[in-house]
Amino acid sequence: MKKLFLGALLLVFAGVMAACGSNNGAESGKKEIVVAATKTPHAEILKEAEPLLKEKGYTLKVKVLSDYKMYNKALADKEVDANYFQHIPYLEQEMKENTDYKLVNAGAVHLEPFGIYSKTYKSLKDLPDGATIILTNNVAEQGRMLAMLENAGLITLDSKVETVDATLKDIKKNPKNLEFKKVAPELTAKAYENKEGDAVFINVNYAIQNKLNPKKDAIEVESTKNNPYANIIAVRKGEEDSAKIKALMEVLHSKKIKDFIEKKYDGAVLPVSE
């Protein structure tokens, strides 16, 4: 009787262990990539990448957050595997402000040329003296916006400062006495619709969400030549060569994704493979 009881007990124990082993195997075999991304165009591009990643054995989960400042924090706090919303100058600025962030660029995916929009004027040269220019309060973006104004001959920046690092305080000449107003990036399209400024800088993602195409609607579009503002996949330092991140980048640099970007955004968003 004792032998029968002991045998039954061993069988139950073996069954429990087998079940545990099976669960652990399923968990360890789970191949999921979690990416925090802004809605347009980033999350849309990732959605197109989802079936391609599935072919490689990965499930893609995309998290759209409500504030730019949340994306790198979520990545640093290991809430996500990667984020997709920023360019390198912005990432570098974020890490200057948050020294505990140890994040790196895993690769560029696309470029969003900045556009300047106006309800009143057809070109930057038409802006009158004292015109109000609305730009974003994102310090890492100011250099690229000011470069557009300098290229149009409206201002002169301090030659000792790298353009990518320039801010409003680096304006040395402003012959038209342009006035500058800073607003959050997500409010620029609204400022344009409400005619709050004579000219308004709008990030492409917010332009697209508000049915604006920089190629067709902007009075000036940022040059893509030697442009350092390509949007990247950012990851934690040391994870850029992990299998899941390599798979993600391979898919995002694939011809199918390149063709999708070119067709869907009609020049407002340009694919990059580097």
From Swiss-Prot:
<keyword id="KW-0449">Lipoprotein</keyword>
<comment type="function">
    <text>Part of the ABC transporter complex MetNPQ involved in methionine import. Binds the methionine and transfers it to the membrane-bound permease. It has also been shown to be involved in methionine sulfoxide transport.</text>
</comment>
<protein>
    <recommendedName>
        <fullName>Methionine-binding lipoprotein MetQ</fullName>
    </recommendedName>
</protein>
<dbReference type="InterPro" id="IPR004872">
    <property type="entry name" value="Lipoprotein_NlpA"/>
</dbReference>
<comment type="similarity">
    <text>Belongs to the NlpA lipoprotein family.</text>
</comment>
<keyword id="KW-1003">Cell membrane</keyword>
<keyword id="KW-0813">Transport</keyword>
<feature type="lipid moiety-binding region" description="N-palmitoyl cysteine">
    <location>
        <position position="20"/>
    </location>
</feature>
<dbReference type="GO" id="GO:0006865">
    <property type="term" value="P:amino acid transport"/>
</dbReference>
<keyword id="KW-0732">Signal</keyword>
<dbReference type="Pfam" id="PF03180">
    <property type="entry name" value="Lipoprotein_9"/>
</dbReference>
<keyword id="KW-0472">Membrane</keyword>
<comment type="subunit">
    <text>The complex is composed of two ATP-binding proteins (MetN), two transmembrane proteins (MetP) and a solute-binding protein (metQ).</text>
</comment>
<keyword id="KW-0564">Palmitate</keyword>
<feature type="lipid moiety-binding region" description="S-diacylglycerol cysteine">
    <location>
        <position position="20"/>
    </location>
</feature>
<keyword id="KW-0029">Amino-acid transport</keyword>
<feature type="signal peptide">
    <location>
        <begin position="1"/>
        <end position="19"/>
    </location>
</feature>
<dbReference type="GO" id="GO:0005886">
    <property type="term" value="C:plasma membrane"/>
</dbReference>
